[in-house]
């Protein structure tokens, strides 16, 4: 199980001078959005936009992503179960958002904070295990995208908790979740599958020389406690 740590694993420090991009990620019920909301209230932090198909500028990114995604789309649309619209949006998000965000970066010194950002999107695609994710075209795309984002992000915050805590939160929180109300064995299998995918992707990020990963156990630490530990890295620290 993860725990609060003062140090982090990885090759690069979690905050660098100049543009800084930090992603919060973790298994369902770990408290990602709660922590993101706390950090987002502070000065010097701006939450990164996610993809919304109703915005014309985002629709343009979908069109521009098609040539690069075509080999992946062929596999996703010709084999059942087929790729869903949300999965397509995740593919576009991971493919185009580095370029998209560079056009509207916050002022120097302001941290761009991702709540379920590009690394999470890659994990979700892999964890869902659709047939198109087993094809060579997806593997090549995934490796290329992960390498790009590993060089773009300056910090990763990974939240986890014991299985029983995560499962209880999924069922008790007001917002919906596809595992909510399912048998416990089904829910615990879901948690384990996603955790394995997170660990696989984070291990690859480290191998690619990506940012350090700060790990916290939200079963023993509150979001406020974690935020207090993270805030100094988002403000004044330099790599």
Show which residues each predicted segment covers.
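NTP-dependent small-molecule kinase module
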Residues: 168-239
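Pre-Walker A adenine-sensing motif
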Residues: 3-15
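Hydrophobic positions on the alpha1 helix immediately C-terminal to the Walker A/P-loop
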Residues: 35, 39
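Conserved lysine of the Walker
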Residues: 32
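Conserved phosphate-donor/acceptor-positioning beta-strand/loop module used by diverse small-molecule
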Residues: 114-117, 149-172
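Hydrophobic anchor at the beta1->P-loop junction of P-loop NTPases
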Residues: 24
């Amino acid at each position: 199980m993860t725990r609060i740590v003062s140090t982090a694993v990885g090759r690069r420090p979690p905050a660098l001078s100049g543009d800084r991009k930090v992603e919060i990620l973790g298994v369902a019920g770990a408290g990602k959005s709660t922590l993101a909301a706390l950090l987002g209230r502070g000065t010097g932090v701006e939450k990164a936009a996610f993809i919304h198909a109703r915005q014309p500028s985002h629709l343009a990114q979908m069109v521009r992503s098609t040539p690069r995604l075509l080999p992946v789309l062929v596999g996703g649309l010709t084999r059942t179960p087929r790729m869903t619209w949300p999965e397509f949006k995740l593919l576009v998000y991971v493919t185009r958002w580095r370029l998209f965000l560079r056009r509207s970066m916050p002022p120097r010194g302001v941290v761009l904070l991702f709540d379920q950002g590009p690394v999470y999107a890659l994990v979700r695609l892999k964890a869902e295990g659709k047939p198109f994710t087993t094809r060579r075209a997806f593997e090549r795309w995934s490796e290329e995208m992960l390498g790009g984002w590993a060089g773009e992000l300056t910090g990763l915050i990974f939240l986890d908790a014991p299985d029983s805590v995560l499962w209880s939160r999924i069922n008790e929180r007001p917002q919906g979740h596809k595992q909510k109300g399912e048998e416990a064995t089904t829910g615990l299998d879901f948690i384990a599958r996603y955790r394995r995918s997170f660990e696989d992707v984070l291990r690859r990020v480290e191998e690619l020389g990506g940012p350090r990963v700060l790990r916290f156990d939200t079963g023993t630490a509150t979001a406020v406690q974690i935020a207090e530990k993270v805030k100094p890295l988002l403000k004044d620290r330099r790599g």
